[in-house]
Amino acid sequence: MVTPHENYRDSGDFPPEESSAAARLKAMQAHERARRAYEEAQNALADELTVRTTSGWVRGVIEEDLRTDRPISAGPVLTWRGIPFGDTTAGDNRFRAPQPAPSWEGVRDCSQFGPPAPQPTYSWTDRIIGSEDCLHLDIVRPRTEEKLPVVVYLHGGSFIMGSSHMLMLRGFELATRMDVVYVSINFRLNSLGYLDLRSLGGDCSANPAVADQILALQWVRDNIAAFGGDPDSVTLMGESAGGAAVLTLMTSPPAKGLFHRAIAQSPPIAMIHSRAQSTLWARELVHRMALPRRSSVEDLRQENYADLVRSGQSMMWRAGELIHLNSCYAPTVDDELIPEHPIAAFENGHQHQVPLLIGTNSDEASFGKFLFQR
């Protein structure tokens, strides 16, 4: 007499209870393979996103362009946000040339933007945003193993406001469409970055913001290869005040060799102060801070940074009254970072000999018109 189990064995099938166990085992094995594959993919991704810089390890994230106002052409990219390239500019470091970022232990989370430089809001109220610990940069690149050229972007904003994480400057499309590593930086602004206070007496830089930009370019030179960028193929790019900064850096001796091409969009290159103009605005800042006339740079270091920005903000209206001084904020000819007016440097052939693309953006002032109409 043949038992049911013998029939199953003869047919090559398993009895119901054994078939169920085999199916469970098969499912468990498939799940384990999937888990291992996922872990391997995650480990590979973590390795790809974890990068060693001269100050320490950083970990980025994968991001997608989430704008919905038009079709998205940029795919997922690797990003590192808020990487410090300089130390805080608060306290004794205020108004001085920037110092490199101090080292840190462990792996720094670089999934969020760093704070912008202290600045007014677009509403032009008394509200001041940002932090003096602002020397951060952001990196965006497509997922590829190839070494890519680099674009370093300097934001505009009349030397008063702006940041690396303005929505239009986040770099998704430039990185993916042009196959570049995109770097955008924060630097000091307004009375904290674009006002030469040497006439007041005390230790300070004539051009803190320009020095910030040079330090950022040095950081890119020393670190960008670890992010898949080519340090020998760097394009410096900026718009409006950022375009003026590009042209200024083309005439700055310490910036020589830090970039190999330049793009200046709508640059107001004439916005450069002489020593006399800077002296006028330094005294005006002291006056608007309601400080004694003989106040020094050290006295200004003791003041709240938001008050310095607010007082500087009110100086803009004074600048509008003086037709020959179109802004109270601008780089200053200082015989060091900016040895001569950039226009004169270009006329005399003293600029860095790199290819330059320069032009004007149509309707650029329409945004300012919108703000004033509000």
Positions of predicted regions on the chain:
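Non-catalytic accessory segments of hydrolases
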Residues: 2-207, 231
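Alpha/beta-hydrolase active-site loop
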Residues: 204-225
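Alpha/beta-hydrolase fold nucleophile elbow
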Residues: 227-239
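Catalytic nucleophile serine of serine hydrolases
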Residues: 238-241, 253, 266
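Short glycine-enriched nucleophile-adjacent loop
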Residues: 243-255
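Substrate-access "cap/lid" subdomains that shape
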Residues: 256, 265-374
